[in-house]
Every structure is written in C-alpha cells, then in structure tokens.
Amino acid sequence: RDKHVTGVQTCALPIWGDKMFSNMELAWETLDKNIKEKIKDKKAIHSSLGAAFFVNDYKRMEGNGNIDEYSSTHPIVRTHPETGKKILFVNWTYTKKIVEMNKKESDETLKKIFEHQARLDLTCRFRWTENAIAIWDNRSVLHYAITDFFPGRGLGHERIMDRIAIEGDRPN
C-alpha cells in the first residue's frame, strides 16, 4: 500500500532543504502521445534500494546505514481512486525497470518520463518557514527534498521535522 496523504511540519527551521512537488496528473496529460501509448498498460518494478545513494547520510544520522531491499511491481499509469484521473506512478528514485521491455528500451523510456516529470511547468518549490506545514496527496504528486542540508555536506544545519502519513489504497 502506498501512503494516501503525507504531512510534514518544521520543528527546527531548515535554512535549506526546500521541498519540490511535481503534478503527476498533469505529467500524464502532457506526456508525448507515443510514450503514453507505449506505457499505458505496462507495469514497472520499484525497489527500496533506489534510495541507496542516501546510505552515507543514513550512516551519519543512524550510525549504521544498513538498508534492506524491498521490491514491488506497480502499474506505470494508475487511476486516482477519488478523481478518476490518470496519473503517472513512476519516479527516478525507486522505479528501476519497465516489465516486458528489455533493459535498453526500459532505461530510455524511463529517462524520457523522468525528464518530463521534472519540467518546471509541472513543478512547484515549497520553501520552509517557521512552523510551516505541508500536506500532499502521495497518489498524485512526486515529491523530494532538495538535499543541501546534510551535516556532512559542509553546511551543518539541523533539520528536525514531524511527519505523519496515512495508509492508502493499492495502486491500480
């Protein structure tokens, strides 16, 4: 199950580490029609090890950095259960391969999709302020923190946030 809704509130105001959001409904609507046709009924493999590039940061924060791998297969295009709108359900961190495509075709297709998802006209940047709260629908947005705040990167700023996530439905 994915997380239906996520909310985050600042406790120690970060100087950097803005949050980026990308609209996956609009990403689907504006995606090249040839790519849409190619992926509309396909599934992709998602892996928890996609975040392994953070392992050194985990080691500094947690003291170990051990990460177990979990993988799952999800539709690339899902239907939002409340709006009925089609949304892209892939992301550059966790999506590793399109099922029923060879590696080269999968990599090329995913690269085009990921570049499309990052277009400025599909994204917004949320700048944290004292006691700010951000709440989003995980089913229809791609989100990530700009990682310019980790202590090991020479900035040394504390980032403390409270997070809540509400379990959602299975992607379909």
Which sequence ranges carry the predicted segments?
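Single conserved hydrophobic/aromatic residue that forms the stacking wall/gate
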Residues: 1-11
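Non-heme Fe(II) oxygenase catalytic core, chiefly the N-lobe of the double-stranded beta-helix
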Residues: 12-133, 138-172
